[in-house]
């Protein structure tokens, strides 16, 4: 090859490189940036009960291709059944299914965690760096468990005799502690924060009592329920019934006691008397069930969507955001002044579905959520008090009988009917709570 030909080839190669820099390389980076941005008509944050339910409802409204759900978890759990898992009546495996199996078919699953919400630009950002813009946003992020706010936890769970029905990682530890119980105190806590399913901390107490009686250990046990609340239950009708059970079964209830420390190596739980700040009492335990402090998701706290306490700031009747009209919410992450339960989510879903329809039609919402929620208070291995009530703490019962009484049929509903209704009705957007049936059963009088 001559020198002239060599120079020509080198110049040609350099020209190709410059062209590649100007076109191919930049094009690749442009497409990468483009690929990191997406747009969807309806974006759902969270793939728990509220998120999947609304995803299914929105799919029918605008088509699956126009809906996306952001959720990082591989597994989806029916958490209400964990009360029975902790008492050995159900398996933890029966409570979970792969998230992929519950995401509505055709709806896009963004398997990431939301790290930033920007309602002023109608966009969110995920931990993978992806930016997703939306026309309508449904926030269903649930709440956070804060075991770490109790000194000695979560590392204390490495020791036996301590469990919690609030996590799939710790619920089986409750059952193990119950089985291994020999004699002494069985202690149960309720934190000084909002919680999901406010009845659950005492349900496991009643089941522990029943188990110890069944196994002949009850005479060696002192069962203690320490709650931060000033009442046993928030609705007087059901609280009165529960106090009767507490007295009949010789259970100890200490109001306004908040768990602040667990000394797992010594089997000691330290509670603060909230009526006398700074005053503490140490309880030795043979078994300890911890209900952790809870709070709003970090991504909400301090965001424009949150109220002063960090919860999603909603109109309590329409479930529309109080500031951003194209933002809506459902479930545990909201500031709705009602008990955070799956039953509440079901009732909210029907109202929210209607609200979004009206907003899309540029009309005012016309359906109102009354705060309906339900708590099946498990009182033994075959009885339940089915508490149902509204925003005002007034009973809103479905059946034409006194639901403050323990009933076997209600246990059957809790253990078998409600899980089926959840998986096959609610998550498919087909169950919006018992409202219509309540009206029917009460002959139109409720």
List PLM regions with ranges.
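Internal hydrophobic alpha-helix adjacent to the cofactor/substrate pocket in enzyme cavities
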Residues: 210, 345-371, 377
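C-terminal auxiliary extensions adjacent to catalytic cores
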Residues: 386-446
């Amino acid at each position: 090859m001559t020198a002239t030909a060599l120079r020509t080839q080198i110049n040609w190669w350099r020209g190709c490189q410059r062209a590649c820099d100007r076109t191919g390389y930049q094009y690749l980076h442009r497409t990468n940036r483009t690929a990191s941005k997406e747009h969807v008509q309806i974006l759902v944050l969270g793939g728990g009960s509220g998120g999947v339910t609304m995803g299914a409802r929105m799919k029918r409204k605008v088509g699956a291709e126009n809906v996306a759900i952001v959720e990082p978890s591989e597994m989806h759990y029916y958490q209400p059944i964990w009360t029975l898992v902790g008492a050995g009546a159900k398996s933890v495996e029966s409570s979970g299914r792969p998230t992929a199996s519950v995401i509505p078919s055709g709806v896009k699953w963004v398997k990431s965690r939301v790290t930033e919400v920007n309602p002023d630009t109608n966009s969110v950002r995920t931990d993978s760096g992806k930016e997703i813009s939306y026309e309508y946003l449904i926030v269903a992020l649930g709440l956070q468990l804060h075991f770490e706010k109790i000194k000695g936890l979560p590392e204390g769970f490495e020791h036996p005799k301590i469990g919690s029905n609030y996590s799939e990682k710790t619920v089986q530890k409750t059952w193990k502690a119950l089985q291994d119980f020999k004699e002494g105190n069985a202690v149960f806590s309720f934190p000084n924060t909002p919680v999901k399913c406010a009845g659950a901390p005492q349900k496991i107490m009643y089941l522990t009592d029943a188990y110890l009686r069944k196994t002949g250990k009850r005479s060696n046990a002192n069962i203690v329920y320490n709650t931060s609340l000033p009442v046993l239950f928030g609705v007087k009708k059901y609280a009165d019934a529960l106090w009767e059970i507490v007295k009949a079964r010789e259970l100890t209830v200490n109001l306004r006691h908040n768990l602040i420390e667990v000394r797992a190596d010594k089997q000691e739980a330290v509670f603060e008397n909230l009526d006398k700040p700074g005053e503490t009492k140490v309880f030795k335990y043979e078994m300890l069930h911890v209900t952790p402090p809870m709070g709003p998701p970090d991504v909400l706290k301090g965001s424009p969507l949150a109220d002063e306490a960090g919860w999603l700031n909603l109109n309590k009747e329409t479930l529309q955001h109080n500031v951003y009209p194209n933002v809506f919410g459902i479930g545990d992450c909201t500031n709705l002044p009602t008990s955070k339960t799956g039953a509440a989510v079901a009732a909210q879903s029907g109202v929210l579905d209607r609200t979004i329809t009206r907003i899309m039609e540029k009309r005012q919402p016309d359906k109102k959520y009354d705060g309906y929620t339900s708590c099946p208070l498990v009182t033994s291995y075959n009885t339940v008090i089915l508490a149902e009530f509204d925003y005002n703490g007034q009973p809103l019962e479905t059946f034409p009988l006194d639901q403050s009484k323990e009933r076997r049929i209600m246990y059957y509903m809790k253990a078998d009917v409600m899980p089926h209704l959840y998986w096959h009705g609610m998550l498919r957007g087909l169950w919006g709570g018992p409202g219509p049936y309540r009206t029917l059963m009460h002959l139109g009088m409720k």
